[in-house]
Amino acid sequence: MAISDVPAAAGTTATTTSDSDLRQPSLRRRSSAGVLFDAARDSGSDNSLTGKITDDDNIKDHKPNNHAASDDNVGAAANDAGQEHRQPVADFKYAYRPSVPAHRRIKESPLSSDNIFRQSHAGLFNLCIVVLVAVNSRLIIENLMKYGWLIKYGFWFSSKSLRDWPLFMCCLSLAIFPLAAFVVERLAQQKCISEPVVVLLHLIISTVELCYPVLVILRCDSAFVSGVTLMLLTCIVWLKLVSYAHTNYDMRALTVSNEKGETLPNTLIMEYPYTVTFRSLAYFMVAPTLCYQTSYPRTPSVRKGWVFRQLVKLIIFTGVMGFIIEQYMNPIVQNSTHPLKGNLLYAIERILKLSVPNVYVWLCMFYCFFHLWLNILAELVRFGDREFYKDWWNAKTVEEYWRMWNMPVHKWMVRHIYFPCLRRGIPKGAASLIAFLVSAVFHELCIAVPCHMFKLWAFIGIMFQVPLVLITNYLQNKYRNSMVGNMIFWFIFCILGQPMSVLLYYHDLMNRKGEVD
């Protein structure tokens, strides 16, 4: 066997023919190029090495004596079986030749600033999960050894909550208001009442639906959990009633425009004449959406096994959330002072200490409600649109966060507040301010009413988002593709804003209870 005088590259072997008169060397490529590909991968994952081998093959195969080349091919085919077992040895011998360049192009380190966001960090993510589990497991064991079992079941399963029959009856009576709205819409469809009367009746129905539970909670010394549950349900029903009335009003207006022969955009999907049915209203009231429409995308069937697994997850994560609240957050809050009245450094220390368990509770709450519960409800009623949230954790601005973290409310705001304001000629900034104002009012109602006090901390916290939106938008426009806004969002929401709100409401609530006692 002779070696070609042309420098051979990785993955090639030299063979001789069986003809004694023609001893011309022939360079033949191996059929399996595993080692060659390994060499190419180690040298930079480019094709230059393969190209070099191909060029060398062409040089050696380009002979003036065609008969010799033909004999070489015949000899190579005949010796395939004999050469097969010698291929690994030859590949190993010629795979990493010193003459082959190891550095072929300009490349960045994987963790350099220009290349770090192009890499996959799945391994580091797994490492963070392992470290997080290990560290928190140690902290839980240390906490239990030091303080013991601090969970008080009375906060979650108190007999007082079971005896809140006025709140329970008020919760059941909320079904009256959708029925009243349906009667109004039927009368409007039959043209028994004029449009101004329809608007007035819907205004009365929605106002009474919102004020009636507030009065019941304030009149009754109910448990906090019962009051929060009733207020959340009240706000959901109110938002649904507004959407139901507004959508039917818009459909009547479109029907009139269609009867006049006006051209409507293709994006409008509705049947003429539209009909008001109790079935569509009943489905809307139980569906995991706040925006009414006559039909929704539906899934073909209910996955019972999947629902059971999600219910198990819901129970587990709800228990984890309750454990963190009782075992960590309550002792921290009870051993703190009012953040606006005590020592500043001590208040900062309490806020920072409260921030970590608060982040866990907030993430568990989001996962339990927006992912588990809403998906369970959607599966049971075969609701097809499961986009209840987007990747809000990657939000670069506060505005992006509010657009992505709660999609049912965001769609309601856009459909019934923001764009109606724009169609009325209101500027975009003012329309956004109105949307935040509505959100702030309902956040305050859901917290202040069950606490039986109106300190406006939740209202101020939501309205404070407006300057944060301007600041983070400015930073995003100035520093393109930066995560400065994302860091500000995480700091304001989880490190400063929510722990501060918890301390403020707790101490104000304790002061109120002390005054009452």
Curated annotation (Swiss-Prot):
Pathway(s)? Glycerolipid metabolism; triacylglycerol biosynthesis
> What EC designation does it have?
2.3.1.20
Q: Does the keyword Transmembrane helix apply?
A: yes
Membrane topology (UniProt): Multi-pass membrane protein
GO-annotated cellular components: chloroplast envelope; endoplasmic reticulum membrane
Q: What segment(s) does the record annotate as region Disordered?
A: 1-82
Its recorded reaction(s) are:
an acyl-CoA + a 1,2-diacyl-sn-glycerol = a triacyl-sn-glycerol + CoA
Compositional bias ranges of the Low complexity kind: 8-17, 71-81
Q: What class of enzyme is it?
A: transferase
TM spans, by residue? 121-141, 165-185, 197-217, 222-242, 272-292, 305-325, 361-381, 429-449, 451-471, 484-504
Q: Where in the cell is it found?
A: Endoplasmic reticulum membrane
The annotated active site, in chain numbering, is 443
Q: Which GO terms describe its biological process?
A: triglyceride biosynthetic process
What is this protein identified as? Diacylglycerol O-acyltransferase 1C
Q: Name one Pfam family in it.
A: MBOAT
Keyword Transmembrane helix included in the entry's annotation: yes
Spell out the Basic and acidic residues composition-biased ranges: 53-64
Functional summary from the UniProt entry? Involved in triacylglycerol (TAG) synthesis. Catalyzes the acylation of the sn-3 hydroxy group of sn-1,2-diacylglycerol using acyl-CoA.
Q: Which family does it belong to?
A: Belongs to the membrane-bound acyltransferase family. Sterol o-acyltransferase subfamily.
Domain of life according to the entry: Eukaryota
What positions does the record give for the motif labelled FYXDWWN motif? 388-394
Q: Which UniProt keywords apply?
A: Acyltransferase, Endoplasmic reticulum, Membrane, Transferase, Transmembrane, Transmembrane helix
